[in-house]
């Protein structure tokens, strides 16, 4: 059984290290220090020992020694021993690796500490350098300040020195001027005294010289008067005695007077003739009649106007069907009147503003092949006393037209008011009488067309001179839609398709949009619809990309509707009937 514990074995076996000794008992050392009562007796130590286990172990060892598997058991024990040794060696290697890792960690920590130390030293050096630089800068700034203070002190001293020198120089100059003034005063005083003394001594001689000069001057004037009188008397005597010279002189003066007055009157007559034939009266604002000056300024336009053919009277004019038929009859009758050289009829066109009265008057003149002239009633009152003469000039000028003239008086109620009830000036009353005098009979030279928003204010004599009354009412739904389409095409679509202007139109249903606009613009006139189309064009031009969108059109329509409502509110406030809650006069809104 000795081989089991590795004591007696063959060579080469059991070469492992001896088993470690069991640790000493805590009470083994220093046991003498304890008391006698603490040390157990040998009898007590082995009294509870059970030898059964040792017996079983000895028995197992004997069986194993006599067993045939003893070698395998020994090999197994050796392998276990080798395994334990390998485990001990691996633990030793791990311990060595841990030691090496600890050393490397120490080296890393030392390197990190060294790096931190170097960084701190570098920072300290930088801080020290910055502090030294700061001190150097402060020293330099202090030097600059000291130098600046020194320079300022030197400059102040120099200025004080200059001021002192200037004060000394000024005092010197003043003293010099004072002395010079004193010397000058003394010299003048001496000269005055000397001159006074000389005058006193030469007083008799001076008086004699003055007396001689006055006598000589008097003698010269008397001789000049005698000579001039003698010459004039002899000349007049010679002229009177010669009757041929007298007759020639009288005839010459007479002819000169006759020539001056004749030239003056002839010039006045020629001027009035030229003004009546070639010029344009001051009351006429616009006319299609061609003048010599206009022909010289615009020959191409004048030639085109001369060769132009009569146009349709309702081209570009949108009216209701009944009104369109009536005005077309008036246009046809006017054209036939011109062809037959008959008498023209006077027409009154009344209705709200912006319904096409002026436009139809122009188209009527072009359709009939006549010239047109437009005058405003508001221009008559400011002329005062010249109004009568200006009114006669207008009718004289209209009577000289070879093609016939359509005289359109816009805002005629401004000066054709009732003479009995209205308070008008004497000059305006005289102008009205002149107008009534010139329109008392029908004429084959001109046709009178009056336009008014308040026809009830006309004088009764004016109503008596009117042959045809036409009411231009506000456009209805169909007329508004036609107007919207026409102006949308004129101011939006045509500029966008021509490509010459910065205007584009977004993609949407134009016809549907025009119908919606016509529905929203109820109560608006044709002029307001045209202004709305112009506002669309302006909004497209003012946008960033130059594109007119449907939203932009809707916004402008809403603004136009609000403005129209505000105008109607103002109209109700301005009308006298608003105090009694009565509606405005029908001529201001519709027919």
Swiss-Prot record:
A Pfam family the protein falls into: ATAD3_N
List membrane-spanning regions: 246-263
Q: Which residues carry this modification: N6-acetyllysine?
A: 490, 494, 512
SUPFAM superfamilies, per database record = P-loop containing nucleoside triphosphate hydrolases
Which portions of the sequence form the region Disordered? Answer: 1-52, 572-591
Q: How does it assemble?
A: Can form homooligomers. Homodimer formation at the N-terminus may be regulated by ATP and is required for the interaction with the inner surface of the mitochondrial outer membrane and correct mitochondrial homeostasis. Interacts with components of the mitochondrial ribosome and with other proteins involved in mitochondrial RNA metabolism. May also interact with protein involved in lipid metabolism, including STARD9. May interact with FAM210A. Interacts with GADD45GIP1.
- Protein name, UniProt field: ATPase family AAA domain-containing protein 3A
* Organism, scientific name: Mus musculus (Mouse)
Task: Give the source lineage, highest ranks first.
Answer: Eukaryota, Metazoa, Chordata, Craniata, Vertebrata
């Amino acid at each position: 059984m000795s081989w089991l514990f590795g004591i007696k074995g063959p060579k080469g076996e059991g070469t492992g290290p001896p088993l470690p000794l069991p640790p000493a008992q805590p009470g083994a050392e220093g046991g003498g220090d304890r008391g006698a009562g603490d040390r157990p007796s040998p009898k007590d130590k082995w009294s509870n020992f059970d030898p059964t286990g040792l017996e079983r172990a000895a028995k197992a060892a004997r069986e194993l020694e006599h067993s045939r598997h003893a070698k395998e058991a020994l090999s197994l024990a050796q392998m276990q021993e080798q395994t334990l040794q390998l485990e001990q060696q691996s633990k030793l290697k791990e311990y060595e690796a841990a030691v090496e890792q600890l050393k490397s960690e120490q080296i890393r920590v030392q390197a990190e500490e060294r790096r931190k130390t170097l960084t701190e030293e570098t920072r300290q050096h930088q801080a020290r350098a910055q502090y030294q630089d700061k001190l150097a800068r402060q020293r330099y700034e202090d030097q600059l300040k000291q130098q600046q203070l020194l320079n300022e002190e030197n400059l102040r001293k120099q200025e004080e020195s200059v001021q002192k020198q200037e004060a000394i120089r000024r005092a010197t100059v003043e003293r010099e001027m004072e002395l010079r003034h004193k010397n000058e005063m003394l010299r003048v005083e001496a000269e005055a005294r000397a001159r006074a003394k000389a005058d006193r001594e030469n007083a008799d001689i001076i008086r004699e010289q003055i007396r001689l000069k006055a006598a000589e001057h008097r003698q010269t004037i008397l001789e000049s008067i005698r000579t001039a009188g003698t010459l004039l008397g002899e000349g007049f005597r010679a002229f009177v005695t010669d009757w041929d010279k007298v007759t020639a002189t009288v005839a010459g003066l007479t002819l000169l007077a006759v020539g001056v007055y004749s030239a003056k009157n002839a010039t006045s007559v020629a001027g009035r003739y030229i003004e009546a034939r070639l010029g344009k009266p001051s009351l006429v604002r616009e006319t299609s009649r061609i003048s010599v000056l206009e022909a010289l300024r615009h020959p191409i336009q004048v030639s085109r106007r001369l060769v132009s053919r009569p146009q349709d009277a309702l081209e570009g004019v949108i009216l209701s069907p009944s009104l369109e038929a009536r005005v077309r009859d008036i246009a046809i009758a006017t054209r036939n009147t011109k062809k037959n050289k008959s008498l023209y009829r006077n027409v009154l066109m009344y209705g709200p503003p912006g319904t096409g009265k002026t436009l139809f008057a122009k188209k009527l003149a072009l359709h009939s092949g006549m010239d047109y002239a437009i005058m405003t009633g508001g221009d008559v009152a400011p002329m005062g006393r010249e109004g009568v003469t200006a009114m006669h000039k207008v009718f004289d000028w209209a009577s000289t037209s070879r093609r016939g003239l359509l005289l359109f008086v816009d805002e005629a109620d401004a000066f054709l008011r009732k003479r009995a009830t209205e308070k008008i000036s004497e000059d305006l009353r005289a102008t009205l009488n002149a107008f009534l005098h010139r329109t008392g009979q029908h004429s084959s030279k001109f046709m009178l067309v009056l336009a008014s928003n308040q026809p009830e204010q006309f004088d009764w004599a004016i109503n008596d001179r009117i042959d045809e009354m036409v009411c231009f009412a506000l456009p209805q739904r169909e007329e508004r839609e036609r107007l919207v389409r026409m102006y949308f095409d004129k101011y939006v679509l045509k500029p966008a398709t021509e490509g010459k202007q910065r205007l584009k139109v977004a993609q949407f249903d134009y016809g549907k949009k025009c119908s919606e606009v016509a529905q929203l613009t109820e109560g608006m006139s044709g002029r307001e619809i045209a202004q709305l189309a112009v506002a669309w064009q302006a909004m497209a031009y003012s946008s960033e990309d130059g594109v007119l969108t449907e939203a932009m059109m809707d916004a402008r329509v809403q603004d136009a509707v609000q403005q129209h409502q505000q105008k109607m509110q103002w109209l109700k406030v301005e009308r006298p009937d608003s105090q009694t809650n009565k509606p405005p006069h029908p001529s201001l809104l519709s027919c």
